[in-house]
Amino acid sequence: MKKPRLQQRGERRIAAALRIALAAALLAVQVLFVVLTTRYLKDHFALIYGALEGIALITALYIYNKPGDLSYRVAWIIPILFVPVVGLILYLLWGGDTQRKRLQRQTAPKLPPEEPESLRNRSALNADRLQRALPGWSRVSQYLSSRGFYLYQNTKAVYLPEGALLLEDILGRIKAAERFIFMEYFILAEGKLWDRMSAALCERARSGVEVKIIFDDFGNIKRFSAESLQTLRDAGVEVIVFNPVHEYVNRLYFNYRDHRKITVIDGETAYTGGVNIADEYANLIDRFGYWKDSGIRLEGEGVWGLTAAFLNMWSFLGGELHEERDYYRPHTSPATDGFCQPFLDGPQNNPDNPAEDTFLQLIGSARRFLYITTPYFIPDENIMRALCIAGDGGVDVRLMLPGTPDHWYADAVADSYIGELLEHHVKVYRYTPGFLHAKSIMVDRETAFVGSVNFDYRSFELHYE
């Protein structure tokens, strides 16, 4: 007999707490192993520990020679060599390619979504227009097009420089929704903001508007209760929890999460950026000082890029669509001069990752200036080299990082790169009012990126962005 949803959710929370505690307990196992072998097997301690270190060394060499980001591989190698009992157990549980392959089979939608020939033809025409208008940027667009991410025109883009502005804008559009509301988020956190958002979503659902939500389970273990989930479902809101925290320890995935932040309303308006649905993003509570974030609102043809992303994920996760796919397409096309090209990334793209490759091309294409904001800066060798080359080449490169970090260890790693950047004429700033969570790139006042991608390995390789 299937358990009630509330009971399932509660059991996952308890199991997750126990499994997180396991990581700390493993350190005690390492200490206990050393103490016991020293005391009771002291005549054989050197042999036993030497054999263990030999296994650890072989494992470390295996990891080192695997493809992928060096910093990520080193992050596994260090604990395996220095605390081999803990390191080997953790790697067996959560390292390697097992979880990636399993998720590719179970939860990975095809990226990008398949589209009709007519859309591909319009994208090609838009590419010709871009080549004539801004020839210097056609290469970046052509790369994304080659990966199946289409170029749109007739799209109005509004930059929203504060989380509170974006969230209030979303809330207002939700209240006016007539056909459907789609939301896909890493975090939905209970609080003042969620009380208003939930009330608006439930009211629209009861009025016959199609409301669908995807949220990541791991991102909400402590922040979104079973009662809040049931309130949505009772009102007619359809909810899918992405990659639920599994009852088995080896399926507690810290990575391979849905890190996207997408809202689509009636197919005419879409939002994305760094802003999750939580009070700190609107500065309704104080966490790490002033919380600086940003996002973008799209209206017109480009909205379809985000709508299709949501629909594809929804369908792959087993959700049903009540209408034909074309029902969800935009019907208005405001005349604009600019171009818009939404793109996605996820672990199934490896080793070909559109996000990092696009960032590298944006950096390499800068002629006058390059401004970057990111909360987490843990670049690989390719990103570091590209930034240093741009700085040495006379480009005004500016990197903005948080003044008050939310994770001290991530900030410590970011600090380790700053010296080299400064040597290559890259200017590095700290957002002194508090925590900077905005993810953006602006190049030569001609091209910009706004989205959910951080400058770190997890965004480039492990998460859905």
Give, region by region, the residue ranges found by the protein language model:
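Helical hairpin unit composed of two closely spaced alpha helices linked by a short loop
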Residues: Y376-R398, P402, H407-Y409
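Histidine/acidic-residue-rich catalytic or RNA/ligand-binding cores of hydrolases
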Residues: N382-M384, D411-V413, V443-E446, E461
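Catalytic-core elements of nucleic-acid end-processing and repair enzymes
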Residues: K439
